[in-house]
């Protein structure tokens, strides 16, 4: 963090992107400015955003690979230049882009001799490769080579115990951190009592999202983190009061969900994830905190279950219902069956 004195004028608090560039497929850069801030506020915002950007942004990566009958990760496979460990490290570096949650399966199945790159990975429709030229292995002989992969969306750095699994699969330390680096600097402007601060924020990402998208998600996460304090008085009310306040007078939310479940019989609801429903970030995060990742999970919740979710409010319930009616009308059943 750098602090400097510069001349400047005060105006309404605003932010903008002052520089944006793509250095490579796996390196995006963005520079943002927020001003004017009162003395001390720039540090507060800068520290919070840096932590949120580096630790709270979700990413998609390969978490497991199955080679078949390979005794251990230090083994070599005939006809392949790299060892199993080197292949695992190459798979760890693959950058993926996806907005869906849960575990996904992928695979590689090729015949040598040839180079294997990220382009050879057979992915589900919801996942995209950022750089298809990333190397994986080099087949030096005419052999059939197949790997089963597991893909997961998460946040932070996840490690697993190194052990031999009975099915021949090996864990890959998941680095679900799309933001590679964050720097911020603070500049002072004005004179005397009119001094203000300008915050400059630099963000580097791995290409799975842009710096602007990362900044938006980090800001949204920080807002959601402080929401319970804004509604502390509301949550302090008795459950009976909340129940009365949340229940519509003529047609309860639970009855509407029950009718929706009956009408949607036969749809693979466990294949429809809630991030496909265009929920607001607040409503979406409430549902995720209650372990409702799919539409089936959401419809399995009773009204009481929803009311017990932290920060869940009446507008969230109305928004969920309106969104379900919008995306799952009766006349679209056939289309939904094609998921």
From Swiss-Prot:
Coiled-coil region(s) at which residues?
Answer: none
Gene coding for it: rpoA
Protein known as? DNA-directed RNA polymerase subunit alpha
Entry keywords, A to Z: Chloroplast, DNA-directed RNA polymerase, Nucleotidyltransferase, Plastid, Transcription, Transferase
SUPFAM superfamilies associated with the record: C-terminal domain of RNA polymerase alpha subunit, Insert subdomain of RNA polymerase alpha subunit, RBP11-like subunits of RNA polymerase
Q: What is known of its domains?
A: The N-terminal domain is essential for RNAP assembly and basal transcription, whereas the C-terminal domain is involved in interaction with transcriptional regulators and with upstream promoter elements.
* HAMAP family given in the database record: RNApol_bact_RpoA
Task: State the residue spans of region: Alpha C-terminal domain (alpha-CTD).
Answer: 264-339
Instruction: Tell me where it resides.
Output: Plastid, Chloroplast
């Amino acid at each position: 963090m750098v602090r400097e004195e510069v001349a400047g004028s005060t105006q309404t608090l605003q932010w903008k992107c002052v520089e944006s560039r793509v250095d490579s497929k796996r390196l995006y850069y963005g520079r943002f400015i927020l001003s004017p801030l009162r003395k001390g506020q720039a540090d507060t915002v800068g520290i919070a955003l840096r932590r949120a950007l580096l630790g709270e942004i979700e990413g998609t990566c390969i978490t497991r690979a199955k080679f078949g009958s390979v005794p251990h990760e230090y083994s070599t496979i005939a006809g392949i230049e790299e060892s199993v460990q080197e292949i695992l490290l190459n798979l760890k570096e693959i950058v993926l882009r996806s907005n869906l949650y849960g575990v996904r399966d992928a695979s590689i199945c090729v015949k040598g001799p040839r180079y294997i790159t990220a382009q050879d990975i057979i992915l589900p429709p919801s996942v995209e490769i950022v750089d298809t030229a990333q190397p994986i292995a080099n087949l030096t002989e005419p052999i059939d080579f197949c790997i089963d992969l597991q893909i997961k969306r998460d946040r932070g750095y996840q490690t697993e115990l190194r052990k031999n699994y009975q099915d021949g699969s090996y864990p890959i330390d998941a680095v679900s951190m799309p933001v590679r680096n964050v720097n911020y600097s603070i500049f002072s402007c004005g004179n005397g009592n009119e001094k203000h601060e300008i915050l400059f924020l630099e963000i580097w990402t791995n290409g799975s999202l842009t710096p602007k998208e990362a900044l938006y998600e980090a800001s949204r996460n920080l807002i959601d983190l402080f929401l319970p304090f804004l509604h502390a008085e509301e949550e302090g009310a008795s459950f009976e009061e909340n129940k009365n306040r949340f229940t519509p007078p003529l047609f309860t939310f639970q009855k509407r969900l029950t009718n929706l479940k009956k009408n949607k019989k036969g749809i693979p609801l466990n294949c429809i994830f809630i991030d496909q429903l265009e929920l607001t970030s607040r409503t979406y995060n409430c549902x995720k905190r209650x372990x409702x990742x799919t539409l089936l999970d959401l419809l399995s919740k009773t009204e009481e279950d929803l009311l017990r979710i932290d920060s869940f409010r009446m507008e969230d319930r109305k928004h969920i219902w309106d969104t379900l009616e919008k995306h799952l009308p009766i006349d679209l059943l056939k289309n939904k069956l094609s998921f």
